[in-house]
Amino acid sequence: MAGHDVKYGKHRTRRSFSRIKEVIGLPNLIEVQTLSYKNFLDEGLANVFKEMFPIDNFAGTMELEFVGYEMKTPKYTVEEARAHDANYSAPIYVTFRLVNKETGELKTQEVFFGDFPLMTEMGTFINNGSERLIVSQLVRSPGSYFHLKADKNGLESFGHTTIPNRGAWFELDTDAKGIGYVRIDRTRKLTFTTMLRALGFGSDEEILELLGETQLLTDTIAKDVHKNPADTRVEEALKDIYDRLRPGEPKTADSSRGLLVARFFDPKRYDFAPVGRYKFNKKLALKNRLLGLTLAEPIVDPETGEILVNTDTLVTRDVLDLIEPLLDNGLGNFVVEPSDDAVIPEPITLQSIKVYSPKDPERVVTLLSNGNPDAECRVLTPADVISNISYWLGLAEGIGKVDDIDHLGNRRIRSVGELLQNQVRIGLSRMERVIRERMSSSENENITPQGLINIRPVTASIKEFFGSSQLSQFMDQHNPLSELSHKRRFSALGPGGISRDRASYEVRDVHYTHYGRMCPIETPEGPNIGLINNLSSYAKVNEYGFIMSPYRRVDRVNGVVTDEVEYLTADEEDNYTVAQANSPLTEDSRFANETVMARHTGNNIEVEASTADYMDVSPKQVIAVAAACIPFLENDDSNRALMGANMQRQAVPLIDPHAPWIGTGMEHQTARDSGAALIAKHAGVVEYVDGNEIRVRRTSGELDIYNITKYRRSNSGTSYNQRPLARLGEKVEKGDIIADGPSMENGEMALGQNPLVAYMTWEGYNFEDAVIMSERLIKDDVYTSIAIEEYESETRDTKLGPEEITREIPNVGDEALKNLDESGIIRIGAEVKDGDLLVGKVTPKGETDPTPEERLLRAIFGEKAREVRDTSLRVPHGGGGIVHDVRVFTRENGDELPSGVNKLVRVFIAQKRKIHVGDKMAGRHGNKGVVSNIVPMEDMPYLPDGTPIDIMLNPLGVPSRMNIGQVMELHLGMAARTLGIHIATPVFDGASDEDIWDTVKEAGMADDAKTVLYDGRTGEPFDNRISVGVMYMIKLHHMVDDKLHARSVGPYSLVTQQPLGGKAQFGGQRFGEMEVWALEAYGAANVLQEILTYKSDDVIGRTRAYEAIVKGERIPKPGLPESFRVLVKELQSLGLDMKVLDADRNVLDLRELDEDEVMTRPDNTEITPEMLEAQEAIVAQAEAEEEALINADTEK
């Protein structure tokens, strides 16, 4: 027997064909979300307050300090927030201290700071009752970047950009004449020496001494001449910069200095963030550009005076390891003094080392670094600017290297915590202005922190982020896998990211640094391809937001591959050689072969085993969770694998799902981490189980009660239903699955079913990937799912009185009311069809003026019956089903309702959706198709033992698509079912051909794994042997019930009077230009006429046609289409006088073309204008009499 048994959870054992020992398990798959939010609450929120406070008034006499904050208990639990359409959030109270610096008086006060959204255990937020999540964002990291560019003549030059987290950009560039320029915040350029002079290096000699002589520098100095002798060189430089940033404004040296300080050196305006400072120091550190250069000075130990490395030594990795600690401790540090009129006249610490130029080995080049400022320094420093220029000049000498912006060392993840932190910062900065003004304007005696603070900017900023940000998304809740995948997704779009239209091919493409960090397979098809990605299965995000991948460390001294795992970021990995996960190892964990396949900076190379630094932990660390659920992924074309991964996320939860016979071993952890299953929080013994709750007695004696969710409507309209898995008296451990969620079976993910599939054609019904299905799958409810739709009705106060929910509805018979209760609301369990009443509701009608007779009757008998119209909630087309739940919210019960709403009723209707012709099905390998025919069981082809086939697929769907994994799954699946064992074949480490054939043989199947099939209609065997087996097939969310729709009469567009389009508007089918041509080609004049008139926009004609059909009369001739009239009006609005003529060339009024509408009374006598005038006179007289009576009363 090939393979070995592995236990997945308590309830499933699979035979696994994996050969590679995995030293670590998968991390918690949603920790990207949960850890980020936890860090935000623990540190991030306090840090923002510390950044913004203290705030002082303009006079500097008062100061408002931040002391601390506390989160109180949430108003609602998660379930209550969901039911009440509320937010799951906790009130936050911040303590402030107001200090009066003149009197020394302190006032400390706790201020309510709004409700703060809380994350659920599943990594989501409840916002207005619906589950949302914040997708992480992939953005350029702040730091120092250098790039190579070529002009149209092919001349290469280098450019530089300093990108801060917040603040002005600093760029360096070279023009065609070889002059270097600086550009501040995308304004006009000026020579880069101007910037150096502004920093306090006025003379040409100082600049040349600092940076060394290079062609670019000398050419630029020659261009940068002293224009105004009245100013010093430093002042002139400052004014030049001011002129570029504020053109046209009067400039002085002091205002120029102030502006430059504000742009780059003021922490309020400029911020690198810790990640920016880390990247900046790393880029400019001398140790990172010495490798491969020759030293032009000896390296001396500062403590002992010993020469460690001689002049003319080539710096290898070993030499670098020797001098690296010295460089970190400040070897080569020196201080330069800028002139007194510099922008910042303080001493500047730099670090230098002399090397020979690789392009001219005779020349000595001085490399400068910024002296490694500490992480607290989050602004640009003069040392940063100088060392940036030094690095840039060094590139022309062949020293240093340019950056690749698509390298994952230069792109980072902004997770939910950081995104929220930014929103709070935006809110606080808006609030700061208000606080400062109030502090300056109020009377000092009675001022309190509460009086100074207006929390609206902060709460508005957070609310706006959750409500309308591109990164705050409605959670994809089709099934557990789609939930998990959505939480692990990150997007390059959104605020501060790139836009879909400008994204180049390079940004979207797979990069070598994605290995083990970002999935190369799972990404959407269409305009977002490559911009929205998923985290690889083992990847984690570090504190700076860079994605790390785990590797086993290789002990190079004794050649052992240790079980010690290290997480490396993309730029750290570039320094090492990493062996592949499938490199064979001996019993004592050494490489079995002398050479191994390895990766180094994106190149796949064969290296000696002794030179490998690390080894991959697992073959599936390359890909994301959804792709890792596809067995035999290695045998599928990547385009089809992409579709397979994406389509698994669209699977509809079935009534009785089954886990696949052929899995990958990922099913259990995916189900557990998705948040859909119920997980034991503590170890204990199950004391009670039923459909609604599970009680577990902890070992410590306490009782845990777990509520089971039954048939809740998910975000996607599918049924979210949990089933208990734990048994009475069972011992459970912490982290065990005690109840299956939707699309789960025995603690494993179960998106579909395991039908018996044959690859064969059948009467042409599986042309173009269509799927032929046996009636058994309908009878046995194999592919039946439940759809739950929510409908709501609310009563409001109108100008004419309040709306009312009632059984008393005008013109509705008793039959229609039979399922409504006494208050007019449908009962739970009622079966309803299209158009049935769900909630009876009446709205007051606008009353017409009463006639004198009515007025008299009203005076005698009092208030007449109110005029109301029926505004009841009815079942829309295609919405029939069983009423599964009704919820009523009223103010009396203490429910929070929107203003103006008195009562809100929610009705949930569940539909049992059996599989139909037109529903979309798919396998896991991107093989999708639409059900084209449902064949009676007795007509389906059958096996020699009489078992009928369940599904027939077209064999032509395999060769051109190159997804051979489906065929391997088919054969192995048949063997697994025959043997009654579940199988795990992990991706890139699964069952080999030999394993499959051995298992097929073990199951007693034929040598070619094919079989003779018999035609169910004739009983004759088919000519050829056919591949028959078990394949995992899923039913997708694209169901025909949601798409099919029909209309006879319905709503029309206001202007054109043509029917609306689309199912949501109950619209018609568009008969477009090309369809009209088709009918014209056949000369079908009458059909054409009725399509362009009655069925479209001949308003009067269609009404008459309808009447005629109802009365059974001949249909009258059509009139004029409304669109003709619209065209005429359009031309008239352009000033073109357009007239319509009859056959005798008489001008017709457009209105005459329609026969006059005749107004009739209820007794069918015609109403004449005289009658109308007489009626008007009677009304006027009655009004005059009434007015006279009122006047007489007031006079009395």
UniProtKB/Swiss-Prot annotation:
GO biological process: DNA-templated transcription
Record GO terms (molecular function): DNA binding; DNA-directed RNA polymerase activity; ribonucleoside binding
Entry keyword annotation includes Transferase: yes
EC supergroup of this enzyme: transferase
Catalytically driven reaction(s): RNA(n) + a ribonucleoside 5'-triphosphate = RNA(n+1) + diphosphate
Alphabetized Pfam families for the sequence: RNA_pol_Rpb2_1, RNA_pol_Rpb2_2, RNA_pol_Rpb2_3, RNA_pol_Rpb2_45, RNA_pol_Rpb2_6, RNA_pol_Rpb2_7
Record EC number: 2.7.7.6
Keywords for this protein: DNA-directed RNA polymerase, Nucleotidyltransferase, Transcription, Transferase
Assembly with partners or alone: The RNAP catalytic core consists of 2 alpha, 1 beta, 1 beta' and 1 omega subunit. When a sigma factor is associated with the core the holoenzyme is formed, which can initiate transcription.
Name the UniProt record assigns to this protein: DNA-directed RNA polymerase subunit beta
Biological classification of the source: Bacteria, Bacillati, Bacillota, Bacilli, Lactobacillales
